[in-house]
Amino acid sequence: MSGYDFPMLSTVADVATLVSTRAAFHTLAERVLAPDLQRATGRIGLRRTAGGFGQPEHVVDGVRRRIRVDGMFLVVDHDGDGESWHDITTLGAAAALVGLPPDAETGVFVATSAGDPDAPLAVDPVAAATIAEWFRFVDTALEEFRHRHAALHPSVVQLWPEHFDLACSIGEINFGGSPGDAGDSGRVEPYLYVGPWSPPPVGGFWNEPYGAALERSAVTTVDDALEFFERGLAAAS
């Protein structure tokens, strides 16, 4: 696989909109999609979906169901009733839509995203599209990486709601991509990462306490991402 071109992050005119949109999506992932999925299946792992991210399809009382985020909308796919599209407004409204209290938890992790049920969830359409495209790019790279190393029994690619990143693992090494970090520390720009479960000391390839990261501005094609993941696998093995 080669030559997969990807729009530069400069398509987002204001980085602040990327940060606020990412924060809103993190809230929805942690406090709505994951708790709803956990009560139905006992699992929390989400997926990259067309237009954004969402639950894997699952069956509740014999009915196929999935909730996902597509751009500015929360989409409920209920087999037989079709899809219903709802504007993203607040955590309280999103939770009520799926029949959850706004303070719902999974019992698997402690949510760290904003939890005010009445605060507006600020979603910018350009930033939402940028995040969706980044997840598509990361998913493409991870699936090719998994295919190359099928003999090592890689895990499936999942979007982890507590971190809001897309990742898989090979042995005791995580490989993934984040749309950026929350809070005042970390990386504002989307980035790829390699995270050994027992991180090596910082130095050389290992440029983060958890392992290694490569910012979006240094990545042009899927081949670039694959080269980074391959370097990480070799360095950690």
Task: Identify the residue ranges that each predicted region occupies.
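N-terminal ordered "arm"
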Residues: M1-D70
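Charged, low-complexity surface segments at secondary-structure and domain boundaries
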Residues: D5-V15, H78-D81, T112-A127, A212-V219
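Short, Φ-rich (hydrophobic/aromatic) sequence segments
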Residues: L18-D36, W134-R146, A225-L233
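Amphipathic, interaction-prone secondary-structure segments
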Residues: T41-M72, H153-P196
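Alpha-helix initiation/capping motif
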Residues: T49, T89-T90, D124, E215
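Hydrophobic, ordered structural segments
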Residues: R65-T112
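Surface-exposed beta-loop interaction hotspot
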Residues: G92-V157
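Long, compositionally biased interface segments
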Residues: P201-S237
